[in-house]
Design a protein with these regions (language model features):
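Multi-pass, polyprenyl lipid-linked donor-dependent membrane glycosyltransferases
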Residues: 210-214, 223, 229-271, 286-298
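Membrane-interface helix-loop-helix junctions at transmembrane boundaries of multi-pass membrane enzymes
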Residues: 9, 311-330, 407-425
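Transmembrane-helix motifs of polytopic, lipid-linked glycan transferases
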Residues: 171-175, 206-229, 404-411
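Start-transfer (signal-anchor) and selected internal transmembrane alpha helices
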Residues: 1-23, 55-121, 323-334
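Short hydrophobic/aromatic helix or loop-helix immediately within or flanking a transmembrane segment
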Residues: 132-150, 154-199, 372-378
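Perimembrane helix-loop-helix junctions
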Residues: 81, 272-276, 280, 296-333
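Hydrophobic, aromatic-rich transmembrane alpha-helices
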Residues: 382-418, 424-428
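Transmembrane-helix signature of polytopic, membrane-embedded enzymes
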Residues: 182-205, 217-244, 262, 419-422
């Protein structure tokens, strides 16, 4: 007996559109029933009945015109093709164990060791488990998600325009789906302070959920990409290394690292498999998630060149060649377009498209190029190893990580390809 195919059946475009709309209406129905509806731009759902009636009408018409394959079979085929069983089996134990371990250790550290003396960090609750994700720059991302970007020309201190919008936008969308829009809507059924705390806690929980889900999705694509270069055992080892190296702590934080990881892996994987639309979406997300996201255009250009060179002797029609080339180029420039979009927005807000870059000086950060790598070397030669690492432990750790990454560029390039080596070189 042959196993069922995991490849989604080829269907007319109207059937795929109807099935997609049906699934979305089903999700909206469930959301409205559980969380009271949602409002996005021109879409407003306040009760589950309207999307439910629309779902039933579209499903009935679709199956009347095309009974086979039914909707549930198409959805199952798509899920099996997108997230194969081997990828799930390899990924979920590593993801769950490492992410929960980081959160558990963090919580135990807070309740057993305590917080530093002085003013406690910003808190949303008396429960330290709820406050745990609220560290470092998380408050800035939540501020953008809840209140949007704000800029004051007379303020010389820190302002939220220094942070890119991808992560706050996704967080805001998820928080609204989880009912945040209804918490502060009058008339309030609880004291304003309690309502505001609940509102903020929904956003904080949504931010952490975005990070954890993004990391999970990124690890699934990471495993599939790794399997194209190595066997299953080595791919599983790569998953473990990715999720447990020292800086992987940020994959369990309400930070941009997880979303950026997902966007980069998604862009790499889909461009390599010639899925131009999906690759473009992931590449654009990378461009609006972190300041270095636009650098992804370099490695994507290498992949695009490889595709074009590989398909030069082809029997395809000129029209198909042109469309294929346009798709490749479009996906390649999306990270740059994301940077331009954010810079254009900042220009409309401040009159300077690079004001977001200048805002980093309030944190004492500035771009100094390769000289950043030379400063630790100079300090090391002057002070000696023990004195330098004792005086600057964080800088020493960062310098060691940078040197290790630089030493791996050539082996990675030789083993996996120039696109990966270039990605490392651009992001050290």
């Amino acid at each position: 007996m042959t196993a069922p195919s995991s490849t989604p059946p080829t269907l007319p475009i109207w059937v795929r559109a109807a099935d997609t709309l049906t699934v979305l209406l089903g999700l909206l129905t469930f959301q409205a029933w559980l969380f009271g509806g949602v409002r996005f731009w021109f879409i407003s759902v306040s009760d589950p009945w309207r999307p439910l009636f629309a779902l039933l009408a579209i499903t009935t018409l679709r199956h009347y015109l095309l009974r086979s394959p039914p909707l549930h079979q198409c959805v199952g085929s798509w899920l099996r093709a997108t997230w194969p069983g081997d990828a799930l089996a390899a990924t979920w134990p590593t993801v769950i164990f490492t992410r929960l371990s980081v959160l558990l250790v963090g919580y135990l550290a807070v309740v057993s060791i305590g917080l530093p003396e002085g003013a406690p960090p910003f808190r949303l609750s008396d429960n330290e488990a709820i406050n745990l994700p609220l560290r470092w720059d998380t408050g800035w991302y939540l501020n953008i998600a809840m209140e949007g970007y704000q800029w004051n020309a007379e303020t010389e201190g820190q302002q939220n325009i220094a942070f890119f919008p991808g992560y706050p936008l996704v967080t805001e969308g998820l928080a609204n789906l989880l009912g945040a829009q209804h918490v502060m809507r009058p008339p309030l059924d609880r004291p304003p302070r309690v309502a505001m705390e609940q509102f903020q806690q929904i956003f904080l929980g949504s931010a952490l959920l975005v990070s954890l889900l993004s990391f999970t999705g990124g690890m699934l694509w990471f495993y599939r990409l790794a399997r194209e270069y190595m066997n299953d055992s080595a791919s599983r080892s790569a998953l473990l290394l990715m999720s447990s190296y020292p800086f992987a702590i940020f994959f369990s934080a309400a930070y941009t690292e997880s979303l950026m990881f997902l966007a980069v892996i998604g862009a790499f994987y889909h461009l390599k498999h010639e899925r131009w639309v999906s690759a473009s979406i992931w590449a654009l997300l990378a461009g609006v998630t972190r300041p270095n996201g636009f650098l992804l255009a370099g490695p994507l250009a290498v992949i695009a060149f490889q595709h074009i060179r590989k398909k030069r002797p082809t029997s395809a029609t000129p029209e198909k060649v042109v469309l294929n080339s346009l798709g490749i180029c479009f996906a390649t420039v999306m990270p740059l377009f994301g940077l331009l979009l954010f810079s254009g927005f900042i220009y409309s807000l401040t009159g300077n498209p690079l004001e977001w870059l200048e805002a980093h000086t309030a944190w004492g950060r500035s771009f100094t190029g390769a000289s950043t790598l030379m400063l630790p070397i100079d300090s090391l030669s002057e002070r000696g190893l023990i004195q330098y690492t004792s005086a600057q432990p964080v800088e020493a750790l960062n310098a060691l990580s940078a040197l290790l990454a630089c030493s791996l560029i050539w082996p990675v390039m030789r083993r996996l390809g120039p696109e990966y080596g270039l990605f490392m070189a651009l992001n050290v």
